[in-house]
């Protein structure tokens, strides 16, 4: 390592990913700014894919934090999203072609009355335009090739679902969901349950595991790393990725028992 090379960083860089940028592209951007900023080479990965059309919290793991990235994939997430009623697209968002329409636009009262049916354990069919593999091929590749893609139902959990704002032909909801939940599918199914059709026009992740959108930095701030801005002002510590794990305080005897692999009978 040369005198000018800075030590490899370890921790979390929390990006506020803009719409249009893929998660893999975001990882590439962080690798570049670290290299240009003079940091030693280190592992970089993300803690949960965020679709290019979505925006918001994207945890980027650096160095030793990459060992915790898998846990972040399993963490619950919170999203704000807007459903526009009247049209369903093949991609279930604004990028696709309209495949079904409805003249029925549900009222806010009807929407509110329907949401409890989508709270708790549910089953949903993922979008055909998704990265799920079917017989070794990505579903979106099959869909783009014009093949009829049959998506199997999956179990997921919606911990909370609430209305944030209503507008003409649209509603914005906030959903706290378990891993593996597809917001586009949730929007489709809510619209269908209301006797309408719908697709997502806005999607923002506001929380991923313990990480909040208030902690996230813009791409402009990340780019400053390449120009010599201190990384330590932006980097969250390794343990920040564990902040949502329940803590159990033990007395010295119980702590010693745990270290020895013994079961604590009083718990």
Residue spans of the language-model regions?
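Extended alpha-helical targeting/anchoring segments
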Residues: 130, 134-153, 158-159
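Accessory RNA 3′-end/elbow-binding domains used by RNA modification enzymes
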Residues: 1-53, 170, 193-267
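Residue-level signal for inorganic ion chemistry
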Residues: 60, 81, 136, 186, ...
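The conserved catalytic core of RNA pseudouridine synthases
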Residues: 32, 40, 55, 59, ...
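Acidic, low-complexity central loop/insert segments
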Residues: 71-124
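Glycine/acidic-rich beta-strand-loop module
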Residues: 43-73, 141-144
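Structural signature of FAD isoalloxazine-binding scaffolds in flavoprotein oxidoreductases
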Residues: 70-85, 149-163
